[in-house]
Amino acid sequence: MSDPEMAWVPEPPAMTLGASRVELRVSCHGLLDRDTLTKPHPCVLLKLHSDEQWVEVERTEVLRSCSSPVFSRVLALEYFFEEKQPLQFHVFDAEDGSTSPRNDTFLGSTECTLGQIVSQTKVTKPLLLKNGKNAGKSTITIVAEEVSGTNDYVQLTFRAHKLDNKDLFSKSDPFMEIYKTNGDQSDQLVWRTEVVKNNLNPSWEPFRLSLHSLCSCDVHRPLKFLVYDYDSSGKHDFIGEFTSTFQEMQEGTANPGQEMQWDCINPKYRDKKKHYKSSGTVVLAQCTVEKVHTFLDYIMGGCQISFTVAIDFTASNGDPRSSQSLHCLSPRQPNHYLQALRAVGGICQDYDSDKRFPAFGFGARIPPNFEVSHDFAINFDPENPECEEISGVIASYRRCLPQIQLYGPTNVAPIINRVAGPAQREQSTGQATKYSVLLVLTDGVVSDMAETRTAIVRASRLPMSIIIVGVGNADFSDMRLLDGDDGTLRCPRGVPAARDIVQFVPFRDFKDASPSALAKCVLAEVPRQVVEYYASQGISPGAPRPCTPAMTPSPSP
């Protein structure tokens, strides 16, 4: 029997699936010599573009007399899928002991995004001089690795035997507390079991907590276990204690059926009683680690983000020849459709290896017969609707506008179903190789709401997410309904969505903000949706691709 007042569960860690700690390992090959007699003493400086400026965040150690260094010091960064995170790697010669690069010590640099590195696991790029030319045949290789274990969970089961009796007319009511030792040597409570009434041989309920909560992901961190006899007054009687580490707990229960036990010691009794042995024993009956896969696990395991664009060409956007039109192609300012395309697509393209994106339009009359279509290729090639990079999507959009007639209605279901087709074929593989993201840019109320709800409910069971950006000042109430944030979306027949896959954002909320703010908002949910889908299907990430640079080890610094 347990006392509910004593049952305590720590606050679970926030589900920040989009944020991970990434370590970058850097090596260079063929660095330029400063002169014919000496080789450089290279160091790599890492800068991150933040708040409109480049800020140094990390640097490697200096290696002496080495033109092809493999650095041992890792460069650590927080990774966010929904942010672009541009990086610069500057290589300089620290022969004279300088701690910052100067023109005469500069050996080359390169620029890329963190997304490009993690999606490819390993990136090799030429080093460029300040004039933009290659620094000879110099190259830099960056290898990404996620800091593992931060999302793992632990399942533990404890029981005790022959605990000291602290009650006069009945038996003890034992419970146990677990503490981890912090860096400042203070103890932090991480778990308290329930109370087992009137029992000197209690079996506590199994419990589950994150490895971070238990030991801050440090398997060698000291853990302290304290056993008490519960008292309703709050003055619980101390029975005994013992210490361990998670490493020891894992090793002691490594084999099937293997258990680990500790003597429960009361220091006061041990010091005063000559023949004192213990105040009972505590047994660890189960210690298992549950691997919780992250978004980066799937990306680094080879999962590609397949990005598709759908653009609203209904008449409610206004005549493109008018400066008031949402599709106006002004030479001075890109319209909202273009701004959203660049902001969101610029990030998604880093996660697609071939950088080719299907782009469709809906709600327009299209040549040659000028019949209304709700899923036409904006490059007018139905057999190959893909565009080369986001710049290709933008170019096709610009060429498409003068050739079509904006019409209506605003039917969204056809394009959702079109993208759902390949997603369903991907689902049948049972592997985490391709996840589809559909970006819908629209200016108004959905005309086929019932069909759209049905299409979304169907897509919620597939490896697919939908991002809707509302352009203009229309009433977007229906879009918020599709988002599902206020409750589970259902199709007209009452079938619920398997998961929330729609993210809606009105562009007007970001028209005065930076493009990165819009991208951050609309893409923030994608990592969670990716992990949710594959976890629901029991699909693990693929094995990380080999990424060790094949280079000769550097001489010792």
From Swiss-Prot:
It comes from the Eukaryota. GO terms for biological process: cell differentiation; cellular response to calcium ion. Ca(2+) 2 binds at D167, D229, D231, D237. The keyword Transmembrane does not apply. Its cofactor is Ca(2+). It is found in: Cytoplasm; Cell membrane; Endosome; Cytoplasmic vesicle, Clathrin-coated vesicle. Residues 306-526 form the VWFA domain. Residues 1-127, 134-263 form the C2 domain. Residues 244-303 are annotated as: Linker region. Calcium-dependent phospholipid-binding protein that plays a role in calcium-mediated intracellular processes. Binds phospholipid membranes in a calcium-dependent manner. Plays a role in dendrite formation by melanocytes. This is Copine-6. The gene is CPNE6.
